[in-house]
Regions:
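Polar low-complexity intrinsically disordered regions
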Residues: 1-5, 69-72
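Negatively charged, low-complexity tracts enriched in Asp/Glu with abundant Ser/Thr
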Residues: 2-26
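Charged/polar, solvent-exposed surface patches and flexible loops
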Residues: 12, 16, 20, 65, ...
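Acidic, low-complexity, intrinsically disordered interaction modules
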Residues: 25-84
Length: 92
């Protein structure tokens, strides 16, 4: 049974992954965000991967789609992170 807390937890995982990328963009080559359900513990995960091919239907998101220009430079697009989390987890 999914809850709003599950959605918020995935939003935070997405935010953290994209922020990790923003903190060290040179550490990645062709970076994408990968969202998936870890079947071992049934928790949705979000991580940055290199050179991974796929579409949003596969859980692969262009990193640029999660970054917006803020007052102090590039930052995580929280609205986009929320949209992605809500597309993965549905409330019962």
């Amino acid at each position: 049974m999914a809850s709003i807390q599950d959605i918020q937890a995935l939003e935070e995982r997405i935010y953290d992954a994209v922020q990790e990328y923003l903190d060290n963009p040179d550490g990645y080559e062709n970076a994408v965000l990968r969202v998936y359900l870890d079947e071992d513990d049934m928790i949705h995960r979000a991580e940055i991967d290199n050179n991974l091919q796929g579409t949003e239907d596969d859980g692969i998101y262009a990193i640029e789609s999660l970054i917006r220009e803020g007052d102090d430079g590039p930052e995580v697009d929280n609205d986009r992170a929320s949209d992605i989390a809500n597309s993965w987890i549905f409330l019962d």
